[in-house]
Each structure stands twice: as structure tokens, then as C-alpha cells.
Swiss-Prot record:
GO cellular component terms given for this protein: endoplasmic reticulum membrane; ERMES complex
Keywords: Endoplasmic reticulum, Lipid transport, Lipid-binding, Membrane, Transmembrane, Transmembrane helix, Transport
Gene name as annotated: MMM1
Name this protein carries in UniProt: Maintenance of mitochondrial morphology protein 1
Segments on the Lumenal side according to the record's topology features: 1-43
Length: 523
């Protein structure tokens, strides 16, 4: 029994349908994770340091960073080609450095300006202006002008300034029209009747009509060029600009008489009336700065004493120079002050910088000349008279402001001084503007010879406004700004009527400005 049991244990019985699968042992067991080279503390420190660096970079480049400057006048494109040099502040290489404790001499306190920083090329380089300098190739006695490669300027801002200046001159001339010494009428009459220039066969010239115009000149196409000048080291700069004035009523009318003094004085008298108007003017204006005439060419005044060169004396001279504008009733004092200022400016033989302007010969000046010759049988608009007047005006203009002749004007002293200091407030501007606009209508009695419009309504035939070509219904403000035109005639003579006597009654007759007194006959 025991033997059978052991035999059964050694040889187990398996059913035929049961299969034994072999057991497979996997030897690729997962390895334990590798230990990190940095500890937790070290990683924390590295992370905090990275965050601090990022925050610092953000603050530096985004919060405290400088924004790039906006491009202005194309300076970014010109900086590389026109590097700025500071030759005035830079010390010369051959001179030894001066110690700060070393006391400078009284005659060498002001640092000298190098000639290389004041010549033409240095000025153009430092102002980033491209211009082609000229070469001494004379043409008709003048150096040839080369156009600048720089973009021309429009000069819109300059037109506004010039228009304001001209408008102020027109307003001042109209306000002072009744002044016996400061009016433009008195100045023209004195100039036309100069005994040194007026021939003996011409009678007294009477100004009958003046029109200062309503339009303003338009400047454009400004360019700066370099011109060779033997009187200036390195040449000089010249600004060329186109100017055009058209559709304006700038005119002057006069009347006089031609005297026949043979065989006896005043044997015959031929009345003549002329009216000259500027239809259009266009040309090229040249402006440059030139040194003024030296004292050797002028009448020198005595050398002033040292106390005259102090700041108080200079302030007194500046106040004296502005006194003629404040005191128009004192022409003698104004002339004396002007002469004193001129003498003071020419002391020590030092030339003063002046502004020179002229026009190129290719200008255009169109005139309209109307004439009336005779007393009873009259000739109107004679072509030969118009040609003579136009030729004379053209010659007068060319002899003064056409190249190579220039007009030289001394520059005013613009150094700030307390004598010229003013105060501008918001309350004073409206008052000043209203005060300048209100211009009263100037009337004249019936016996005076003011020509132009007659009285309105029941006014007399000779009385009325002093403006020609303006309706009676205009107020004083409109009269002052419409045309700035006024008339003048001698007292006690016949009045130049325009057919508007006594409230526009009867047939209206018209006459040319500056015509003879009996041009129009009453019906």
C-alpha cells in the first residue's frame, strides 16, 4: 500500500487533453532611477537667479530704455555723410594745454574763431545743405551762378511774414496821411520836386493819386548757392528766390505842366497828366550778407570817449533809435538821433555786416501808363509818352537793384535790452487789435481840393471821403482797408469831380486819375 502510493506520486497522471506550457523568466527588469547631479537647493537658487535676470533685463530694455528719436528733416540719412565737427571747442594740436589756474590775459579772453569754421563749405557742411560752389568764370563781369543740388524751399512761412509787414506799412501810411512831415504824400512831393534834379521846363509836380496796392508778393523756389567773392575769404552764400506780384493796383498819378521859357519865361504852358500802374512784376531775388562799407569810405565822426562805450550808452542809443517811431511830431530830433546812431555804429573803423539784395537781369516789369496832354484839345494815351515813361522807369529800376548793382541795408541791433522790452497779455491784444482797426473817415470841407468821391446825400460837391473807387456806404473800417488810396490837390483851384455831386444827380461823367481840372464839364 505504501509502495503503490509512492509510485503514484513519482509518476503523476495527466489527462491527454491537458498541455503544459513552459514558464519563461524575464531577465530585463527595470533599473532604479539615477540620482540627480544637483540638489534641490542648488536648483532653487538657479531658478531664482534666472527669474531675477529676466526681470532686470525687462526693466532695463523696456522701462528705462531710450526710444529712438523721430526722423526730422532727414537727419538720419545725412548723419553718415555729414559728420558734425566741433572745431570751435576742440583744442589745436600744436598748442600746449592751458592750466585752469593760469590767469589769462585781458586781451585774449574771447576765444578766437577758426577760419575753417566760418567759411562757406563749413557752414554748408554743418547745416546739412548741399550746394555746388562756383568757380571764377566771369560772364559779363559777374561770376556764373550754379544751381544748388538741395531741394528748393516753398517759403510759405516767409510769405506770411512779408505780407504782415507790408500790411502794417500800408496801415501806417494811411494813418499818417494827414501828417505834414511824416506822410508818404509829403515825401513823394519833396522827391519829385527836388530842384537839383527837376528840369527848369517842368512846373511843380502835384501828386493826385496814390495806391499802395492790396495784394502781396509771393516768394517761392528758394535755393542757396555759393558764390566766389574776392572780398570774402572762401566766398559767400547767396539765396535765390522767385518773386511774383500780379493783379495789384499799385499806382501813382501826377499832374504838371511843361513850360516854354523862350523868348520870355512862361511863354506857353502845356498841361500834362500821367498815371503809372504796375500790372505785374516777376523776377529772381538775390539776398546775401556782405560786410558794410569801411570807415575810409565814409565821413568819420570823432572817436568816442571810453564812457560812451558802456552798456548804458548803448541802451541810450537803442532807445534814441526807437524814438522816431514813438514821436512822429519831432522830425528834427529823429534825424539827429538817427545820425548819432549811424556815427556810433561806425566807430573804430570796424565794418558792420549788412544785407545786400538785388534782382537778376531776367526780371519782368509790366507797366500801364495813361496820359492826358493839353488844355482844350487834349490827347489821351499817347503811345510815345507811354514808351518814354516805361523806359525811364525801367532805367530807374535797373540803376538801383538789378545785377551787378545791389541795395545794401544795415542790419538792426537785435541784442536783448530792457529799453525794448515789452509785455504781451491776452487782454491787451484784443484792445490793440480793435484800436488799429477803427480808422475814422477823413473828410474835407467843400473848398479843399481833395478829389475822389463827393459827399453822400446832402453833402457838398467837394466834400466826402478821401478814398477813390469806394462806395459811399462803406464804413470807416472798410475805408481804411479797402484800397489804401487817397487823393490830393491844391487848395483854391478847380475840383476834380467824378459826376457824383449832390447825391449822384444828373449824368455821371468819369475822368482818368490825375487828369486836368477842367476835364469834365457839368451839364
Amino acid at each position: 500500500m505504501a509502495g503503490s502510493t509512492s509510485a503514484s506520486l513519482q509518476t503523476p497522471y495527466f489527462p491527454s487533453s491537458t498541455q503544459i506550457n513552459p514558464v519563461r523568466v524575464d531577465h530585463t527588469l527595470p533599473l532604479p532611477p539615477a540620482q540627480p547631479s544637483l540638489s534641490f537647493t542648488q536648483g532653487l537658487l538657479v531658478g531664482q537667479l534666472s527669474v531675477v535676470l529676466l526681470i532686470g533685463a525687462f526693466i532695463k530694455f523696456f522701462i528705462f530704455g531710450e526710444a529712438p528719436p523721430p526722423p526730422s528733416r532727414g537727419l538720419s540719412n545725412r548723419t553718415s555723410t555729414h559728420p558734425r565737427s566741433y572745431s570751435i571747442n576742440a583744442a589745436s594740436t600744436d598748442s600746449s594745454p592751458r592750466l585752469l589756474r593760469e590767469k589769462p590775459s585781458t586781451s585774449n579772453i574771447l576765444r578766437p574763431v577758426p577760419s575753417s569754421s566760418t567759411n562757406t563749405r563749413s557752414i554748408l557742411r554743418k547745416t546739412y545743405y548741399s550746394a555746388t560752389p562756383t568757380h571764377p568764370t566771369p560772364k559779363h563781369g559777374r561770376p556764373r551762378l550754379y544751381h544748388s543740388s538741395h531741394q528748393p524751399e516753398s517759403l510759405d512761412w516767409f510769405n506770411v511774414l512779408i505780407a504782415q509787414t507790408i500790411a502794417q506799412y500800408r496801415q501806417t501810411a494811411y494813418i499818417l496821411k494827414d501828417s505834414p512831415t511824416s506822410s508818404i504824400l509829403a515825401s513823394l512831393s519833396e522827391t519829385l520836386n527836388n530842384p537839383e534834379k527837376k528840369p527848369s521846363f517842368i512846373d511843380i509836380i502835384k501828386v493826385t493819386d496814390i495806391s499802395l496796392g492790396e495784394e502781396f508778393p509771393i516768394f517761392s523756389n528758394c535755393r542757396v548757392i555759393a558764390v566766389e567773392d574776392p572780398n570774402s575769404d572762401g566766398g559767400r552764400l547767396q539765396a535765390l528766390m522767385d518773386v511774383d506780384l500780379s493783379d495789384d493796383n499799385l499806382s501813382l498819378a501826377i499832374e504838371t505842366s511843361l513850360l516854354l521859357n523862350y523868348p520870355k519865361p512862361f511863354s506857353a504852358i502845356l498841361p500834362v497828366a500821367l498815371a503809372v500802374s504796375v500790372v505785374r512784376f516777376s523776377g529772381t531775388l538775390c539776398i546775401s550778407f556782405v560786410p558794410g562799407p569801411r570807415t575810409s569810405d565814409q565821413t568819420m565822426s570823432p572817436i568816442p570817449t571810453p564812457h560812451d562805450t558802456t552798456s548804458e550808452a548803448i541802451d541810450d542809443q537803442s532807445s534814441d533809435q526807437s524814438s522816431p517811431a514813438q514821436n512822429p511830431d519831432g522830425p528834427k530830433d529823429a534825424h539827429a538821433n538817427t545820425s548819432n546812431t549811424t556815427d556810433a555804429s561806425s566807430k573804430h573803423g570796424i565794418p558792420k555786416t549788412s544785407l545786400a539784395f538785388s534782382f537778376l537781369p531776367d526780371y519782368r516789369l509790366d507797366l500801364s501808363v495813361r496820359s492826358l496832354i493839353g488844355s482844350r484839345s487834349r490827347l489821351q494815351d499817347v503811345p510815345k509818352v507811354a514808351q518814354l515813361v516805361e523806359a525811364r522807369v525801367q532805367s530807374w529800376f535797373e540803376e538801383r537793384v538789378v545785377e551787378p548793382r545791389v541795395q545794401v541795408v544795415g542790419l538792426p541791433n537785435i541784442w536783448p535790452r530792457m529799453g525794448r522790452t515789452g509785455l504781451r497779455s491776452s487782454q491787451e491784444e484784443p484792445e490793440a487789435g480793435s484800436g488799429s482797426v477803427e480808422i475814422p473817415v477823413m473828410t474835407s470841407p467843400g473848398t479843399d481840393g481833395v478829389s475822389g468821391g463827393g459827399g453822400s446825400g446832402g453833402g457838398s460837391g467837394g466834400g466826402g471821403g478821401s478814398m477813390r473807387g469806394i462806395d459811399r456806404g462803406l464804413s470807416g473800417r472798410e475805408v481804411g482797408y479797402e484800397a489804401l488810396r487817397f487823393r490830393h490837390a491844391a487848395c483854391g483851384g478847380h475840383q476834380n469831380q467824378s459826376g457824383r455831386d449832390g447825391g449822384r444827380g444828373g449824368n455821371e461823367q468819369f475822368a482818368m486819375p490825375g487828369s486836368m481840372p477842367d476835364t469834365v464839364t457839368e451839364t
